[in-house]
Swiss-Prot record:
Pfam family membership, one: Ribosomal_S8
Keyword presence, Zinc: no
Protein name stated in the entry: Small ribosomal subunit protein uS8
InterPro entries assigned to the protein according to its UniProt record, in alphabetical order: Ribosomal_uS8, Ribosomal_uS8_CS, Ribosomal_uS8_sf
Species in which this protein is naturally found: Pyrobaculum arsenaticum (strain DSM 13514 / JCM 11321 / PZ6)
Gene3D superfamilies: 3.30.1370.30, 3.30.1490.10
Signal peptide: none
GO terms (BP aspect): translation
SUPFAM superfamilies in the record: Ribosomal protein S8 (SSF56047)
rRNA-binding as UniProt keyword: yes
Amino acid sequence: MVMLDILSNALIQIKNAEVMGKRQVTIWPVNKLTYYTLRVLQRYGYVGEIEYVDDGRGGKYIVQLLGKINDIGPIRPRYPVKYREIVQWEQKFLPARQIGILVISTSQGVVSHIEAKEKKIGGVLLAYVY
């Protein structure tokens, strides 16, 4: 099976595990973009501990779920966004102000839309979570 979008696969695995009420999920295959996205989710309290397991086939992450995710998903296609346009994308993907985050890949790394607005930087939209 050819995996075209590893990040989308990881987010859907998290969503399915949350719906089923699981306490942890194993994400495989992985890449650096997936790891940095998980770190943003961890920083905002949507997931717990992230553990990397090297299985000799590219590795996998075991992510502890906290039951705080109502919806999570990739943003496809990955739209480029300027920092002045972030509010418009918030209104499109998030249910209300101050609820949820957009994950953005910027020149300064993968950050949330809140951090991108504070730093006044744009980037590419990767995912949403609330």
